[in-house]
């Protein structure tokens, strides 16, 4: 059953990643690897930074084990109060952070980018103001999707990427002539709205209702925040690397930061299709096995997951490294995407490919530590 679910999620993720490549192809064809795309990718890294930090990363992995234990200890009705408190706290926090991003967009970009060209900086500044509230919608989506996965409603949660990519693709094509790169920013924001909206029907099937409760004294809320601290430190360490990479890239000739992004999309394809699909399906099974103290199931699931991952990732790594230039040419070289952009992007992709197996394995191993409430090793890694 676990690997049947994994296969379904992999198929959906494969479709999502293919659409992701189509999205990048369209962005590359319409805008190329230029100062304008550097501004767009730099602006969207800021809400993405906070989203990974508080939404997709720490909250999802901390929230589900506590939720499952709460149901075992006190029943679903009591544990639902915990869910409502978490979601309402997210709304308050992310709304505040999004407003701060808008108010202090210039100061943030001066820290995270190295734009010397005033035009690129001003474009990034306006784009950051447009996409800031993406953080609110996608952080909520991160918790809601974790809840759906826990109830084995994998297909809807896995389809978030499809909605994201379709929104960007359609938005770019519809708005490119009237709004240029700013149309891309608007499509990016709308994708967050649509991802959350898509999951709400199944969320209400599980929860039945919604309560605007803030219970900061809830024992499960307190425990969640305590467990989040080391997780946040670990994720922050990784995310800050991306911000630093982008800062250095924006100090180089126009288009360098965009080439870095285009290469990372190809590198993230096998991670998204294989590593994340397996991790998403395995995590609820591990969490429930730990609650019932079934260590035999935990060992079996982790071992099977690692073997399956290696079988899928090693060939992917070899292909990406050996055929980097051909792949980049096939996918990106059209419209405004030049031969110079192909060379920079393919060389970057080869370096990414070397670390593919190791980075993919982290997705599985960190979750196996999280279910035991072990945050130390993931933070160190």
Describe the function of each predicted region.
Residues 1-381:
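Membrane-embedded alpha-helical bundles of multi-pass transporters/translocases
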């Amino acid at each position: 059953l676990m690997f049947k679910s994994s296969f379904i999620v992999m198929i959906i993720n494969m479709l999502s990643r293919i659409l992701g490549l189509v999205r990048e192809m369209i962005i590359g064809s319409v805008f190329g690897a230029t100062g304008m795309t550097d501004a767009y990718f730099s602006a969207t890294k800021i809400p993405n930074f906070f989203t990974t930090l508080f939404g997709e990363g720490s909250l999802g992995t901390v929230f589900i084990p506590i939720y499952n234990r709460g149901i075992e200890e006190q029943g679903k009705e009591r544990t639902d109060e915990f869910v409502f408190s978490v979601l309402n706290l997210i709304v308050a926090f992310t709304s505040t952070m999004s407003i701060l991003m808008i108010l202090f967009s210039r100061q943030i970009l001066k820290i995270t980018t190295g734009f010397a060209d005033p035009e690129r900086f001003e474009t990034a500044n306006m784009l950051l103001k447009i996409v800031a509230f993406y953080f609110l919608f996608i952080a909520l989506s991160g918790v809601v999707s974790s809840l759906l996965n826990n109830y084995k409603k994998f297909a809807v949660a896995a389809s978030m990427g499809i909605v994201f990519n379709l929104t960007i693709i359609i938005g770019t094509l519809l708005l490119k002539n009237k709004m240029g790169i700013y149309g891309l920013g608007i499509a990016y924001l709308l994708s967050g709205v649509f991802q959350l909206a898509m999951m709400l029907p199944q969320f209400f099937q599980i929860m039945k209702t919604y309560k605007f409760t803030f219970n900061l004294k809830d024992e499960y809320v307190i425990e969640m925040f305590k467990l989040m601290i080391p997780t946040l430190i670990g994720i922050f360490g990784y995310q800050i690397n991306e911000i630093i990479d982008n800062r250095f890239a924006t100090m180089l000739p126009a288009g360098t930061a965009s080439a870095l992004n285009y290469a990372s999309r190809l590198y993230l394809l096998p991670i998204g299709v294989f590593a994340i699909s397996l991790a998403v399906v395995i995590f609820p099974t591990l969490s429930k096995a730990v609650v019932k103290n079934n260590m035999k199931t935990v060992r079996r699931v982790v071992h099977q997951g690692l073997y399956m991952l290696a079988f899928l990732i090693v060939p992917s790594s070899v292909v990406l490294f050996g055929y980097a230039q051909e792949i980049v040419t096939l996918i990106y070289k059209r419209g405004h995407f030049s031969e110079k952009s192909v060379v920079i992007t393919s060389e970057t992709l080869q370096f990414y490919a070397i670390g593919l197996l190791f980075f993919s394995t982290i997705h599985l191993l960190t979750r196996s530590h999280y279910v035991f409430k072990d945050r130390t090793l993931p933070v160190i890694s």
